[in-house]
Amino acid sequence: MELNNYQKQVMRDLSAYLDCVNRGTNLFSAWREYWFSKDVAVGLGGVPSYNNSIERAPHVCMKVPTGGGKTFMACASVRRIFDALPTGKPQVVVWLVPSDSILTQTIRTLSDVDHPYRQRLDQDFAGRVGVYTKEMLLNGQNFSPDTVREMLTVCVMSYGSLRIDSRKKDVRKVYQENGNLFRFAEYFKDTQALLADTPDTALIQVLRHLEPIVVVDESHNAESKLSTEMLNNLNPSFVLDLTATPRKNSNIISYVDARELKKEHMVKLPVVVYNRTTRQSVIQDAIQLRGSIEQEAIAAEAAGGKYIRPIVLFQAQPRTGENSDTFDKIKAMLVSMGIPENQIAVKTSDVDDLKGQNLMSRACEIRYIITVNALKEGWDCPFAYILASLANRTSTVDVEQILGRILRQPYAMQHSSPLLNTSYVLTNSVDFHTTLEKIVVG
């Protein structure tokens, strides 16, 4: 898997910024020089001034729409960043994710030697790559000063596993004395790098001493004071944020327009938005539209195209009152309309009908997925064509994130029918519709 055109431009932007950091006297001058080279002012109507929230380490963001291949670009960035850092340091990456579902997904893809993400890392580091979970690190499983010196070490962890104020016992272990890591303590030369009031053998001390590159996936979730403290506690040498919806104080070095993704057939655009007057009509029309798209998909496959089974993603309301359109009510309505139960899956914080399912498989029957917030980010399925929202969301970030779940283009290729190259949204919420229109037009 090779970088496409817009991804190559993002890599060029990163390299240009790293050059400015190495030439500059501080992070503020590097930021000004980088944007000056693009004829863009800093402040005064230009890009915002550099936000120096992480002590002594460059902290920048790539703004890439959902479906744009952020994770692959992050993998391609690692070699570039290490090449720009002082030589002789251990090559360690701490890869942070916001949820358990994304954690599992990231560990799986980075560990799979046949997956493009891992193949990119293997290509750039001559196959000498180790991927570790928090549990593996705590147990010292193939994790020692020797292995760290010899290979790229990628530590995949959740934000929550590093928050120092956590009351969870398994989280606090990161900050506790650990006999499995005593060999690392023998190598600590810079005692100023150690965290105060924390044992030398604690995992957090080991990571601080290694001064890792930190990759922050879905970084719009890591802007609180606690999250900033978490990042500073890692004593990073570089922080790379990945998100489609950066916060205002993000140091964005590269912007990718959704139209660039369309050119590369990465996403289903345009997004067609339908506003309905009742919740019942949202559900009925979503069923009918999905059926029409599936007929097009069957005809396209018969003419030599790829297999596609269109899916509707229903966004239900949280259980706040008797009139709430909760996931169980929506499922009951679908069944009453003649939809077989084996075509319906629920994905919430408590129910996970998607576990173990390969939605891209011809053997899978699922055509309707009902969620509340569990699929807001970090999940997408190219077969998801229709978002039917019964929730009254007004947050631009939340709406853009849920919209992103249906944008990825099946097989990253143009299909013969326009219906198969388009995403669809149905809603009966005026607030959701208004927020969505701003995103689509913008």
PLM feature segments, named:
Residues S161-I164, V171-D241:
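SF2 helicase catalytic motif II
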Residues I252-K347:
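Conserved interdomain linker/interface between the two RecA-like ATPase lobes of SF2 helicase motors
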Residues T71-G88:
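Walker A/P-loop NTP-binding motif
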